Curated annotation (Swiss-Prot):
Pfam families: CortBP2. This is CTTNBP2 N-terminal-like protein. Residues 87-285 form a coiled coil. The gene is CTTNBP2NL. It is found in: Cell projection, Lamellipodium; Cytoplasm, Cytoskeleton, Stress fiber. The lineage of its organism: Eukaryota, Metazoa, Chordata, Craniata, Vertebrata. GO terms for molecular function: protein phosphatase 2A binding. It comes from the Eukaryota. The modification Phosphoserine is found at residues 284-285, 481, 488, 523, 527, 560, 563, 568, 592. PANTHER family: CTTNBP2 N-TERMINAL-LIKE PROTEIN, FILAMIN/GPBP-INTERACTING PROTEIN. Keywords: Cell projection, Coiled coil, Cytoplasm, Cytoskeleton, Phosphoprotein. It comes from Homo sapiens (Human).
Amino acid sequence: MNLEKLSKPELLTLFSILEGELEARDLVIEALKAQHRDTFIEERYGKYNISDPLMALQRDFETLKEKNDGEKQPVCTNPLSILKVVMKQCKNMQERMLSQLAAAESRHRKVILDLEEERQRHAQDTAEGDDVTYMLEKERERLTQQLEFEKSQVKKFEKEQKKLSSQLEEERSRHKQLSSMLVLECKKATNKAAEEGQKAGELSLKLEKEKSRVSKLEEELAAERKRGLQTEAQVEKQLSEFDIEREQLRAKLNREENRTKTLKEEMESLKKIVKDLEASHQHSSPNEQLKKPVTVSKGTATEPLMLMSVFCQTESFPAERTHGSNIAKMTNTGLPGPATPAYSYAKTNGHCDPEIQTTRELTAGNNVENQVPPREKSVALAQEKPVENGGCPVGIETPVPMPSPLSSSGSSLSPSSTASSSLTSSPCSSPVLTKRLLGSSASSPGYQSSYQVGINQRFHAARHKFQSQADQDQQASGLQSPPSRDLSPTLIDNSAAKQLARNTVTQVLSRFTSQQGPIKPVSPNSSPFGTDYRNLANTANPRGDTSHSPTPGKVSSPLSPLSPGIKSPTIPRAERGNPPPIPPKKPGLTPSPSATTPLTKTHSQAASLTTAEDLASSCSSNTVVANGKDVELLLPTSS
């Protein structure tokens, strides 16, 4: 610690420490003195009692005796020496006090001299004070004169004040008149203000009414805005659906172009085959060909198909019409047809091509029309069976030359029949739309309104969306079946459902084999869910108008309430591919929840559907014309 450079708080702490040490030392000294005081008094005055005169005399005697002896040392100190010391100190104090007294006397003398000087100075001041009084008298006279002047000035000011007061009185009277006039004007103004207040109240009431009307108009405007947003959302939804339709139509156009190319190649090959057959059968006559036995081939799903074309259900059929016209040309030439080659039906999602099948029925029906009665014709039409997913798609017949050319109605296409066929074969079709479309096709087969076209296109877009979502879910779960069998969205069959389906198939086969009576035609109102409007529409339409759309006896859907039992055709997964991208919508619009909700089926529904699927896939019906008669063959196929 540097003692030369200490701050003030450090010095204070140091001084307090030193002071504490000094106080401690004094306390220690006092304690030691208190301890030795009793011993000191005992040593010095222990022998004598000061209050007893006898003891005092004895003490003095002893002291004198000691002086006389001189040999003995007193035990305690001699009090005479102490008294001498005290006397010396008193003398010193006396001398000191005398010196102080002399100093006080000298100071007193100085004070007296100062007082004398002050007295002389005061005398001089009094002498000078006479002159001051004279000057003060002169000053007083001057001030009196000034006072007189001020008094005269005050009088003048008073006169002026009187004049001003009179003027003020006049001004006051004038102001009173003005104030009375202002009061009258103020009353008038208050009356006007009251009137204006009443007017303002009326205007405020009008304003409230206007505000209420404006609020109502704002509410209406908000409602209109909501309607506008809803319509905008609907328009956006329609635009997205139209974009999806456009992409689908582009894909369909590409598929149609590829299909036309393949059909042209097939047509060229068929022309070559026909030319070869004409060259080989030049020497044979048509009568000999009719007497030859009919060859019936029972095709199963394992046999290779000669002519197989798979396309979407929503596609049009320009290539099929070409193919049908080629068949009509071949039959119109009157040349003999081959006995062994067979025309295989092109499948539309698991169903036979309606145009080729209708052409076959027309060529066979025109030849056998004179031999078969009308009742047998209706029975044969009612006995036509559809080809399901796992069934045999090939129907084989003996081509017979047709004496008369085909009418144009056999290959005509109407948009209403296309819409009705697509709606009736769809799992999402509704009976009301089916009834309307079939009614319109029955009334005017060649015409379809733009509203029905829009409904048809929108329905196909929605169905494509749902099927693509279902296929993506099945691909993600690893449950995808082969494309030759998976032509409709079905659930996976378990072993119990398959066993039950096989049992039902055997029962149905035994029932069909044991049945020998004539088969009655199906009534148009035989649907378990009420009137089957598709049968009514097909009975109302001529046969030529329904050549494009499959008949109700051939194509039906187990999921639709109008015709249960047979699975609806869907788009093949091999040709469908990935769905077109959905265009982005506005951020304020939310997608409809129906587009993202997957279709679910309960276990009982799945069991019933798998039973119907196994029944339809294990049995295939082929109608063969042999010697002018319709032969119905029910053939079990390999599952």
